[in-house]
Amino acid sequence: MVLAQGLLSMALLALCWERSLAGAEETIPLQTLRCYNDYTSHITCRWADTQDAQRLVNVTLIRRVNEDLLEPVSCDLSDDMPWSACPHPRCVPRRCVIPCQSFVVTDVDYFSFQPDRPLGTRLTVTLTQHVQPPEPRDLQISTDQDHFLLTWSVALGSPQSHWLSPGDLEFEVVYKRLQDSWEDAAILLSNTSQATLGPEHLMPSSTYVARVRTRLAPGSRLSGRPSKWSPEVCWDSQPGDEAQPQNLECFFDGAAVLSCSWEVRKEVASSVSFGLFYKPSPDAGEEECSPVLREGLGSLHTRHHCQIPVPDPATHGQYIVSVQPRRAEKHIKSSVNIQMAPPSLNVTKDGDSYSLRWETMKMRYEHIDHTFEIQYRKDTATWKDSKTETLQNAHSMALPALEPSTRYWARVRVRTSRTGYNGIWSEWSEARSWDTESVLPMWVLALIVIFLTIAVLLALRFCGIYGYRLRRKWEEKIPNPSKSHLFQNGSAELWPPGSMSAFTSGSPPHQGPWGSRFPELEGVFPVGFGDSEVSPLTIEDPKHVCDPPSGPDTTPAASDLPTEQPPSPQPGPPAASHTPEKQASSFDFNGPYLGPPHSRSLPDILGQPEPPQEGGSQKSPPPGSLEYLCLPAGGQVQLVPLAQAMGPGQAVEVERRPSQGAAGSPSLESGGGPAPPALGPRVGGQDQKDSPVAIPMSSGDTEDPGVASGYVSSADLVFTPNSGASSVSLVPSLGLPSDQTPSLCPGLASGPPGAPGPVKSGFEGYVELPPIEGRSPRSPRNNPVPPEAKSPVLNPGERPADVSPTSPQPEGLLVLQQVGDYCFLPGLGPGPLSLRSKPSSPGPGPEIKNLDQAFQVKKPPGQAVPQVPVIQLFKALKQQDYLSLPPWEVNKPGEVC
């Protein structure tokens, strides 16, 4: 219970104590002092002082190991304080390095600060002369009309009351206005515990402040100082060394306590800690008073208070009191204050990832464990936002997947982590940076794939279109009967030779040069040329047509067509009747082209020499086949319409047949009704390669089979100028009347030499024969009977005269040579084969010179005539739209068939 009352009294005393006293605190150098060692070679200490304190006094760091002597430490100015924060805004950091070769777990280092010069003061105190009476309390003021009464009380019942009596005390009253200072305040003395302030003391309409204190009366045997004022007061002393403690005062309370106080400048007190040291007698040992309390005195000084106990005032009546800097120490153990050197950091790349590797300074004690802290961040981030990893006793770390095309920074630090050894983190290593490789993001790859896919699709589309166009152009360049412009009368249905009654009875089946038979040609059926097809080619001997057949077929198979025919014939004497004839090609004129039958795909139109037959008999022509075209015996033949040549009835029947010719490929008109074909003997006197074959022409019957013709081209045709020949046309001799010569090969019509033939602007199924000099017979368009041949007719048994290969106007028939599915004009030797072109303007006009005349080139003797390309030849054909044979001479009628 007594203890509780005592604690309550102390609490109330603390609350009622108006003075603000702070306990003794550490100075700023001691507060900021931090020391760490590497436990190998040195100790590093960091502390700070204030700029204001350095202007008055400098302090030095002192080190003491265990109980050894004090050793000053040299320190340098530093830029920062990484280990602690300075409580003052104007701190001056310092860094000290203390070499040390020995570190023991039991060693303890003591650090303190000492001023650069001696600082202190001394005082001798006599108790009777240093008496301070108690201060007044219960100060009250009351109003009495225009006066004010100030009252207070003093407690004299204490143990020292026998020293003091009311007669030894007096009271000093000080009052002032609120805005005035206490130095300017008025003073009133009173020997009682009250004082009266009247109007003469106070100013109207002002606020005053008063305070009272107790002091010894002048007649008292005691001396000392008055008690404290109710409120505290501050004043300045004379100037001097501002770093020295000032106004040291000690007062004995007359019982057992000697209270001492002193003042120190605030700037000095922040750096140097002063303590109160006293001696009860001069021979006694010096002791330090504690605790020391501080009190603020305005903005310049700080007052320190300390109470010295006086156990026996009678025995020890004189105390020696001094104020001097205290030696404050701080305990720092080396084994728990280790800071290692910063590691050295390197960045390495391992394939697609990155790794951090570091090395630390080797310590003397290898059993101490290490803990590493690694930080890495992007270049745009700060270290506070970085990623931190902590590893134990490791010297490398593999980084996770990093962002591409990004700069990264990394750093590392280390600290000890073994039991009994502790410290702080080392300084951060030097930050290392590196740039990651660039990688295309997924959305870019997706866009690239999309664009590539679109580009490939577009490329395939355009390539397909371009390839289709190239294919179309290539197909257009390929010769095709459907594209020919040789004839302009549309399609025509012609009757194959097999439908002719003259050859259907008493004749063996059609047999080709290879022994193949075509029984399908025995029937009679119409042929429509809707689609251009290659006409079949049958290699036949013209003599088989003109002579009666006898004996078996001994014609050998012809070899394949050579790619090029010699341009000149081989002249020779006429052969006997039993000599094997030259094998020739038989063609069907069943459309706007001359083509061979399908008996062979690549025939040799000139064939191979036929072995002699027994008894001189020859094979009869196959039924329904006309091997070559027989022309009149000479002279110029006028253009005869097909309908007129075949008769009105036949023409009507032909017109009723459906036209299947391709656009741009007109064919000859055909008359209806069968008629005996006009056949002529083959031309003799030529070798196998230069012997022309006859062109078969027949009037179709509804039952005759027809085959589409092939292209006409020539790789070996040689053109020579023929200025004297007039424009002629090849006219089919179809449907000749019965009053013509019964011979299988009609003769050539003769005429006067030099008579030019008429030039026709349009042709509707005509074949014009070459003119004979001096004659130019014509047949009116309305005359259905063609002109009669005037020249003698060759019999099948007669041998024609040889054709001179050097004749300027050789005579012969236009034959075709099949290569694959196309027909070409074979070479006719050195003789000219003139193709004349129609004039570009419609209507009759002068003839256009042949190609050799268009290109006037002088040819030296013995030099081969240059060959005209096939395309140029067919361009000439397309300009004229009909084939022109060279003129025949009258004196060589036997060379017609």
Swiss-Prot record:
Disulfide bond positions: 35-45, 75-96, 86-91, 250-260, 289-306
Domain Fibronectin type-III, first and last residues per copy: 133-240, 339-436
Ranges facing Cytoplasmic side: 461-897
Motif (WSXWS motif): 425-429
Extracellular side: 17-443
Biased composition (Low complexity): 723-752, 830-840
Annotated Pro residues bias: 564-574
Keyword line: Disulfide bond, Glycoprotein, Membrane, Phosphoprotein, Receptor, Repeat, Signal, Transmembrane, Transmembrane helix
Annotated stretches, region: Disordered: 498-517, 532-630, 648-812, 830-849
PROSITE patterns membership: FN3, HEMATOPO_REC_S_F1
PTM info: May be phosphorylated by LYN.
Annotated membrane topology: Single-pass type I membrane protein
MF term (GO), any: signaling receptor activity
Coiled-coil annotated residue ranges, if any: none
Classification via Gene3D superfamilies: Immunoglobulins
Motif placement: Box 1 motif: 474-482
Pfam families xref list: IL3Rb_N
Cellular-component GO terms for this entry: external side of plasma membrane; granulocyte macrophage colony-stimulating factor receptor complex; plasma membrane
Recorded disease: Pulmonary surfactant metabolism dysfunction 5: A rare lung disorder due to impaired surfactant homeostasis. It is characterized by alveolar filling with floccular material that stains positive using the periodic acid-Schiff method and is derived from surfactant phospholipids and protein components. Excessive lipoproteins accumulation in the alveoli results in severe respiratory distress.
Record's subunit section: Heterodimer of an alpha and a beta subunit. The beta subunit is common to the IL3, IL5 and GM-CSF receptors. The signaling GM-CSF receptor complex is a dodecamer of two head-to-head hexamers of two alpha, two beta, and two ligand subunits. Interacts with TMEM102; this interaction occurs preferentially in the absence of CSF2. Interacts with FCER1G; this interaction is direct. Interacts with LYN. Interacts with JAK1.
Domain-level remarks: The WSXWS motif appears to be necessary for proper protein folding and thereby efficient intracellular transport and cell-surface receptor binding. The box 1 motif is required for JAK interaction and/or activation.
Descriptive protein name: Cytokine receptor common subunit beta
Organism (species): Homo sapiens (Human)
Lineage of the species this protein comes from: Eukaryota, Metazoa, Chordata, Craniata, Vertebrata
